[in-house]
């Protein structure tokens, strides 16, 4: 789940536009507790705002053994911010966006630092994406183990490219514009069968 909490964070609180209520970090943590108790959620991205470091520390302490807590806005692929998170115990995973930090050297440095401290890495697109396959190569080459991408053509191009390099692929993706989830079973990468790409409506 990508909460993008920075989008509705202000002065250490969070505005839920559905009813105009303001919630604390603890309130959101309790909501996440309900979600993971009732649904098979294994990863939450940007669960709190990028400046809510104390909240992130609390969230991580509470859910570290149950959830992958991914910092995107929190870290912005920046090693200085990642080191701050490591020192504070904030998050346990980082979203890696090569074209956000600006160079391959800085991308590699971020992955190395994360791995040295037991943080998981998720190679990622940014908000707009093409069929370019560079992040697929980086995901395999740097051994991130996870990749995040969107849009059907973009997804397929990266799956095909991953199939050239990886041994096995497990893909979990976002919803498309029609509200459908694009999913893929675990498959052996060699000779990926595109018929395994499937759509499943969520009621």
What positions do the PLM features span?
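Toprim catalytic domain recognition across nucleic-acid enzymes
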Residues: 153-203
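Catalytic core of soluble alpha/beta enzymes
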Residues: 1-152
């Amino acid at each position: 789940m990508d909460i993008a909490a920075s989008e509705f964070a202000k002065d250490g609180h969070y505005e839920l536009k559905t009813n105009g209520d303001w919630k604390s970090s603890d309130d959101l943590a309790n909501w996440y507790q309900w979600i993971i108790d009732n649904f098979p959620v294994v990863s939450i991205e940007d669960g709190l705002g990028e400046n809510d470091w104390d909240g992130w520390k609390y969230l991580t302490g509470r859910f570290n053994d149950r959830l992958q807590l991914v910092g995107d806005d929190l870290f912005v692929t920046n090693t200085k911010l990642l080191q701050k998170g490591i020192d504070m115990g904030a998050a346990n995973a980082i979203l890696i966006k090569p074209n956000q930090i600006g160079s391959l050297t800085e991308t590699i440095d971020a992955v190395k630092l994360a791995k040295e401290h037991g943080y998981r890495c998720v190679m990622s697109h940014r908000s707009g994406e093409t069929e370019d396959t560079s992040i697929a190569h980086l995901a395999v080459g740097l051994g991130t183990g996870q990749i995040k991408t969107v849009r059907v053509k973009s997804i397929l191009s990266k799956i095909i490219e991953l199939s050239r390099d990886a041994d096995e692929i497990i893909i979990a993706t976002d919803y498309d514009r029609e509200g459908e989830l694009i999913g893929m079973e675990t498959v052996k990468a060699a000779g990926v069968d595109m018929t395994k790409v499937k759509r499943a409506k969520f009621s």
